[in-house]
């Protein structure tokens, strides 16, 4: 399932009419008088990326006008999911596979909201997947990026080293990858003293997450991502201005997990290894000294 991108519509979809900026005047001259009048009344200027809902005779939306100026890219239609009323929409355009895949991916990514702790959920417009699009690539990319965004957006109180390990286990388990975790004092036994030193003051023990997947004879690809779930600076205590965004100090770990998901989901012929040192750099009597 791809958020707000569907392969079929439950209700008749509204067309998104793509008009090249250079062709706008000629296109407009061929439109019904009602639409000409509406476009004029709205003071619509045909600049690239702008859109306008065109009314039907019953006062509903008949179609959506979109002005294209330049090549398609992943964010070409990304404003529309939030601008248009919820419902189903199709795009009438001569897409290549790459263009269709990127446009659908950008549409879905534009609907992302971190609302895990909210009761009410925002609704968006749904795009019918263009025929030329690679559905699996859209799904894979959106799921991977959503994973990365969710992990980074989680408050530090809800994602410590053990939580990052659990997220890694979920990704590894989906593709039957092998995972080992070296935790706490075992880091010293296996010669990872700095991972231990940075995280030893936290109640949630430091750990090294190690995931392997794929044919052992395939070309080796190793991804290493920093997993500092929160960074106070230890006893070299950071000021508030430098600490406010430190929940994102594990963004490297989130990114390699998202990339690993894409690699494994695509079945790429590689021997993949993912290494994530996961710690919370906290403050206590045994905190790391600078």
Regions found by a protein language model. Name each.
Residues 228-236:
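Short acidic, Gly/Ser-rich segments with clustered Asp/Glu that frequently serve as metal-coordination loops
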Residues 1-229, 242, 262-266, 270:
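N-terminal hydrophobic/helix-forming segments and targeting peptides
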């Amino acid at each position: 399932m791809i958020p707000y991108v569907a392969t079929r519509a439950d209700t008749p979809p509204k067309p998104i009419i793509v008009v090249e900026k250079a062709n706008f005047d000629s296109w407009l001259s061929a439109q019904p008088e009602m639409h000409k009048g509406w476009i004029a009344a709205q003071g619509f200027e045909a600049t690239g990326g702008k859109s306008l809902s065109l009314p039907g005779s019953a006062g509903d939306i008949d179609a959506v006008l979109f002005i294209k100026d330049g090549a398609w890219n992943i964010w070409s239609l990304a404003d529309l999911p939030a601008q248009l009323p919820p419902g189903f929409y199709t795009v009438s355009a001569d897409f290549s596979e790459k263009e269709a895949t990127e446009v659908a991916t950008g549409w879905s990514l534009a609907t992302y909201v971190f609302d895990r702790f909210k009761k009410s959920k925002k609704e968006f417009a749904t795009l019918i997947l263009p025929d030329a699009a690679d559905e699996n690539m859209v799904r894979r990319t959106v799921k991977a990026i959503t994973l990365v965004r969710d992990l980074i957006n989680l408050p530090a109180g809800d994602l410590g080293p053990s939580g990052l390990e659990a997220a890694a286990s979920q990704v590894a388990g989906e593709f039957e990858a092998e995972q080992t975790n070296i935790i706490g004092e075992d880091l010293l036994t296996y010669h990872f003293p700095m991972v231990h030193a940075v995280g030893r003051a936290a109640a949630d023990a430091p750990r090294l997450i190690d995931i392997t997947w794929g044919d052992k004879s395939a070309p080796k690809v190793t991804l290493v991502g920093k997993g500092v779930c929160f960074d106070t600076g230890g006893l070299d205590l950071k000021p508030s201005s430098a600490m406010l965004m430190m929940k994102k100090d594990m963004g490297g770990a989130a990114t390699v997990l998202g990339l690993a998901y894409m690699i494994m989901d695509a079945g790429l012929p590689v021997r993949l290894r993912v290494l994530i040192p996961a710690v919370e750099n906290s403050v206590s009597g045994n905190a790391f000294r600078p």
